[in-house]
Structures are given as structure tokens and as C-alpha cells.
């Protein structure tokens, strides 16, 4: 990509404003609780902004455009599925989770299944979240490398510095404030770009003239089994993700938590559609382009320079903000559930620094991992991530919420372990299979259903 002076000026100005928000937020951070959940004082907009900052990352923008370039409308499953997941979370999960007054999903499971549940849930959730960080890191390195004409190592170093500016100083407050600004930029640039691409191709009728119905216009163009896996992975993964639940814990009350989820869904669902259309536009006019460069190339070459520069900044913020929010979730899990619960570190300042160092460590680990996967699909890592997150958490947590007191501790632990072990084993044996998540859910139910049925029968006697 060749940037003009106005591109660069607009990009730098936008990044400066958002990083300034992150540094300003750090003034409010005095303890680990402030860093993790913002002192539990966030309003609806801050909760929604914090969730949006994490979900609208490399997959929702660059990855969805890459999918649109490759197979069309089926790439919309990522943001559509995540939005449906947030609606379900708002309806059934937000209130009981916020009322618990806890900080992590693992703590919620420990109360019901005993202390052994904490490390199992934390490690499983962190493994799943890690692959989402991989996805956004992949997008970030390609994007920053293209903007600054840098190789892998310098681009990775820039990513680390930006993540530190986002979260290292401000925690959940930084993620929320930056999220609000970023969402505004995404809507102002991606939607304008999508509209211009749509009209340039002659609307739907014009698109149908140059693209066949299958696979380009079908949500099941990649196969019904893969589409259903993608949808259920997103729903299960969203509900099971520490980073999103952490935003609920930061809300001032349960009503605010539910409304924040609802607003986040309204933001997430439409974002993927213009990215898909831009992907198809670039496929039509530049079929030789590397698919992962689709969206940055469009913003640089098909929008006015001032808007294109802001759009590129929005993509950088989108990718890096997602890394920041997800890394914060992993850092919180490890600091609270491993160092706090297992290693008995209870000093608030020590936990704060452990959390910050974990954010940095996880970011570096993801950047090392992508070095050997630089040409892979962004969305594939996210769908795998969501499936792994839900494997040991979704149904056990759901059972506790809907069948309170009806799940035995041993059954809960076996369900968690069985789901995680079977999911990992299945993916290792059949790496391209779309059934990983369903295998995990089957093993969850294998232990949960008998326990719930037994306790329900005995409670009626």
C-alpha cells in the first residue's frame, strides 16, 4: 500500500486520540479490581463499548472481508453469530452472572463444582481465547506491515507497543473508552466503503451478473455442516468468553449488564456485511490480490485520503483493541484463578502487576505463533477458538444457571474435563472436521444430564 500525506496525517491523528484515552484511563487504576472490572461502575455505553472493542477485531473486519473475497456471504457468520450470542447472553446470562459479584467465569464454576474447577476452566478458556488473539495478531501484523512497509519483526514490535498503550495502563477502562471511539470509526469508514462498493457493482442485480449464486450469495455456500459449526461456535464461544463476561462484571448492576450486551449485539451484527461486500468488490476488480489485504487495500485506494487514513487507523485499532481485550481476559484468569486461588497470591498490587505481565506475555506468545502461519485464514482461528472456549465451560455454566443445585460436583468436573479432552483429541485426529464443538458438547451432556435427572427426580420425592 502506498499512503499519501493526508493518509498518514489522518492515521496518526486518530491513533493519538485513542491512545490518549487509554493513558487517561490509567489514572483511575489503583488496584487489581479497578484494572479487571473498572471498580464495577461501568454504565451501559461503557459495557457495550468494552464488548465491541473486543469482538470487532481482525476477524470482524479484515477476516470477514478476506472471507467475502474467498467465498462471499457465508463470511458474515462471524459477526452474525456473535451478535446472536450477545442477544442470548443479554436474555439469560447477564443478570445471574453480574449478581454473583465475581470477576471470572472460573470463580463462578468453583462455587458450584469445587476448587478443582478453577484451573480446568481457566486453562481451557485461555487456550481458546489464545487462538482469537492469534487471529487478530495475524491481521495486525499484515496491516501494520503494509502501512509502514515493515517486515514481520518490526511489525510485531509495533503491535506490542500499541497493546501496551491500550490495556497495560488502563485495563478494562481503556478497553471500553477506546472501544467507543473505534466503533464510531468503523461505522464511519467500513459502512461508507461498503455502500460505495455496493453501488459501484450495481447493487444486488449487478452483483448477481458477475457472481454465481453458489457459493457467493448463500450463507451455506461453504457447506451446511461448516456453516452450522461456525454459527454454534460463535454462540457458545461468546457466552463462554472471559473477556465478554468480564465486561458484564464491570457493570454497575445486572440491568446495565443486560442492556450493554443488547447494545453490543446491535453493533456487532451489521458490521460484517459491508466487509463482505468490500471483499467481493475487490475479488471482482483485483482477483490477484492476497486475500488478507482486501480491506486495507480498498480503504487506501477507493476512499478519499482523509477518510481512508481514518479507516486504516480504525482497522489498526480494531485489531489491536481486540488483542488488548482478549489478553486482558487471559491475564485476569491467570492472576485470579492460578496465582490467586492456587498459588495464594492475595496482595492487590502484586495481582495487578501479574495481570499486566500476563497481558504482555500472551501477546508475545501469539506473535511468535503466527510467524509460521502468516498466510492462513483469519476466520479459521476464530472459529477454532470459539469451539475450544465453549468445550469445557458453556454447558456446565448453563446447567448451573438453569438447574441451580441440581448438578453434582463430580458430574460438573467430569463434564468440564470430558468436553475439553474430547474436543482437543478430535481436533488433533481430524483437524479439518467441522464437528469438534459438537463432540465436546456431547461429552458435556453425557455427565450433566444423568446428574440433573437424578437430582430432579429425588427433589420431587
Predicted regions and their residues:
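Membrane-embedded helix-loop-helix hairpins and adjacent transmembrane boundary segments
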Residues: 1-461
